[in-house]
Amino acid sequence: MRAWTWDLFCRVIDNWGDVGVCWRLARDLAARGARVRLWIDDASALAWMAPGGSEGVEVGAFDAALEPGDVVVEAFACDPPPAFVERMAARTPAPVWINLEYLSAEPWVERVHGLRSPQRSGLDKWFFHPGFSAATGGLLREPGLLAAHAAFDRDAWLAASGLARRDG
């Protein structure tokens, strides 16, 4: 079975939080065997955030996106370039188009996660809302995180840091 190609579109809006979320998603997908292309309008944050890059993640300029892959993710409603959307509509089968929204614990998120949004192009866009309940998209979690958390020795870390534990 061939690996799916994922195109992630990201516009840096404020303090690089957007690219941080997209970078984590790109790394996670690549670690699962997907081919990932991150199309970003300001890659300067990656110079300090991920100076070595990540195996399986290709980074390109936002407006330089080529032929659409199998899945297109627009982070935080950033809309892929119009010419790219035209190529999406011409592709058979059409790619799955996902609008990745911000993390929220608000109750309304459960009602809109997974909703279809028909587009002028004839394509459907699907809302993906990360969240904290089974009715949302959940959270990204690095492999081994729970085991590392369980093995963490707070007292030893504090002692090694020259800090004393305080109750409260």
Where are these regions (language model features)?
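Positively charged, low-complexity intrinsically disordered leader regions
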Residues: 1-6, 130
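Residues that mark the start of a beta-strand
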Residues: 5-7, 167-168
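Active-site and donor-binding regions of nucleotide-sugar-utilizing enzymes
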Residues: 7-122
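A nucleotide-sugar donor-handling region in carbohydrate enzymes
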Residues: 102-168
